[in-house]
């Protein structure tokens, strides 16, 4: 508006690639959440809130079906990625257990997609 009112021109360019919004595949999310719940995980963080930070997973999600789920760390005090308190959540026996659960979830979800062609439709 200001450029138009003063007769000035404005030009700009991005100095790096932009991050696209996340296009989460609803079917994959539902399958993965159900699998996580079967494995005893119930602390999901809802995706309708504004996320802090940025990621290229949004770009990926526009190129292929993507499933992105955030889980609560249940840490006290709360721990968020990229801060020192988060290190306690990603080291030690609990971290290895969570890695095993995540691996099982991805494998079982992929198996369901392969065995049920209606999911891909």
Task: Identify the residue ranges that each predicted region occupies.
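Metal-dependent amide/peptide-bond hydrolase catalytic core
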Residues: 1-121
